[in-house]
Amino acid sequence: MKKFYLIAVPIVLFAGCGGNGEMTVTEKDGYNIVAQKKGPELGYSPNSGIKLLKARGCIFKDLNRNGRLDIYEDWRKSPEERAKDLSSQLSIDEIAGLMLYSNHQSVPGSDLTQEQERFLREDNLRAVLITSVKDAETAARWNNNMQAFVEGLGHGIPGNTSSDPRNGSNSDMEFNAGAGGKISMWPSSLGMAATFDPQIVYEFGTIASQEYRALGIATALSPQVDIATEPRWWRFSGTFGEDSRLSADMARAYCDGFQTSPQKYALYGAWGTQSVNAMVKHWFGYGAQEGGRDSHFAHGKFAVYPGNNLMEHKIPFTEGAFKLNGGTSSASAVMPIYSILWNQDPEGGNVGGSYSDFVINRQLRQEAGFDGVVCTDWHITYDNTTMDYRGGGKPWGVEDLSVAERHYRVLSCGVDQFGGNNDKGPVIEAYGMWVKDHGEESARARFEESAYRLLINVFRVGLFENPYLDPIESSRIVGNPDFMAHGYDAQLKSVVMLKNHNKTLPIKGHRKVYLPKRHFPATAGIWGGMSREYWDWQIKPETVAPFYDVTDNPAEADFAIVAIKEPSLSMGYSLDDVIAGGNGYIPVSLQYEDYTAVYARDESIAGGDPLESFFNRSYKGKTVKTANRDDMVLVQETRRKMGGKPVIVVLEVGKPVVLSEIEPYADAILVSFEVQNQAIMELISGKHEPSALMPMQLPKDMRTVEEQFEDVAHDMECYTDADGNTYDFAFGMDWSGVIHDERVSKYTR
């Protein structure tokens, strides 16, 4: 039962407060809410031991329980003033805790785990990365339990929960206007880029930020704004494509949407209770991975720049995420790359991004003028033990240093926080190393500098005043019908029509469609394990049935829909090749047929690892098979079965694809980027018209893929189809033909 209290506070005239001093306290489930006429709403747990302070007609939380109003407790002060005061009060142990960012934490229930209680209490950790949550109500209750727990510790610093992107689409889920879901569903970042409309990305940010805050999330580990200049790269789908100008505009819109609170919710300028800190990543040059291999693994630790084009990779940051329009000025945090920028440091330091003074201090802090939080990517200080996914850590270039020495080097480069580190011990050791080298005063100043940056981001979003959530309200906000409708509309606008021979689409009226099953092969997971092999529909018959009659007999059908996925790529490394006497390095293929790397480099640009006795990582002459080759076979067989009747190919992608094996057999091709299949059907049936454009080039063949430069965009020979259309960046079609609008004019070179 809710209880309400009225407490009379003497009237004292004071700038920023005043009024009659009356406040209302509402008792909730495990926490209280304080409403005051001339100040922000306060939330606190009656079990945490903190009290309320009354000063000049205003109410404050006595977070350190010392009976007086400290500057950091005074919401009338700026975040900068408050962060400076609190950072000066904290012990080195407490600051070391702020420098930690937890390992991935799932939230299956509302109670804290023993591990969570331990790192919150003993290690003073306050930045928690959550992954899966049961539902919005459970997430809100977990948040409240976590906030009540830390509120009673030390200086009462609230938890700052974060998340990787969590608004992807479930392809089989049906969209019903007026119906809600677990969370609003949007196309992938690459799909957002395919709209070529930053306003859609801004709208996504404003909606996702509300959902994040309702889940207790105040920091987004996004956007990923690397320009994907290497077409084989595993993480291509998480980017806004290969173009630096488009990526910059999308990055700006994304950060503005997430960080800007509407005036009603603003606390400090545009910062407020609907703001979510954007941690833009990855500074910088990550999209140039040699051979497409990824630096999560030792075999992909190098990014290379044969086109001498490293500095273009800064543009989405310096011209986008660091130049916002919404009032928060800049993305509040940055995550550097894992990769070694091969031979790019003028002083010769081939080390991972967070270990590089060139990358952080010189390029980010000095050249770009960024003074916000810098947080390492996850597990860079851990040891690495193998060349494949089992290795563990990512200490690229500093494998010979101890864990504590790695922490010290990272701090020396200007980094503030360690992703995936729950243990304050190595940070304390690094402090001791700094004291030994530079003295206690310098070490204390360096730690306070990071504490100041980290705390500003917590003050700006109002967590010190009220970190608590109403679980029922959270359930109402997350995935509400309006948010779902906006996400679905973005999905419709993200699907590219590549081919429409003889105006095959749209197909209107009562027709019969042949819908063949797809082979889902058993494939190795990125982190190990094998998927199950089976046959099923990529687009379910029940999704198609509202639009057409479905048949399994091609002879009866008026047309066919063949839904497939892009070629399943290898990671560019194989233990089987090592066992067979090779160096382990294999091609990454973008085609369905077996691929032999005839045109690969004789000598790799980069190389060397403590676990290898050689430098050259070339895979020239080696052959790889594509696990889902049957997708190509399915298209070709369907063409044969259908004779001259239309065959529509629906291709889900997350990176460029060689289409020479598919396009000649299709009358129409739709390219999707992780959308609901219902959206595909609404386009095929003509309920909506396609409007998206390709955010990347589609290569003619694998030779042009091998011969392009990893660091340069728009440098491949593109595929030209049977109708004479070339699948270049910004190509797309609507019912009238090839699109030539202001978006194409703005972004094509």
Q: What is the meaning of each model-derived region?
A:
Residues 1-2, 19:
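Generic cytosolic/nucleocytoplasmic N-terminal low-complexity/intrinsically disordered segments
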Residues 2-8:
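Sec-dependent signal peptide recognition
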Residues 8-9, 287:
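A periodicity- and composition-biased signal for non-globular, repetitive helical segments
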Residues 10-16:
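Hydrophobic h-region of N-terminal signal peptides that target proteins for export
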Residues 16-749:
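Glycoside hydrolase catalytic-domain context in secreted enzymes
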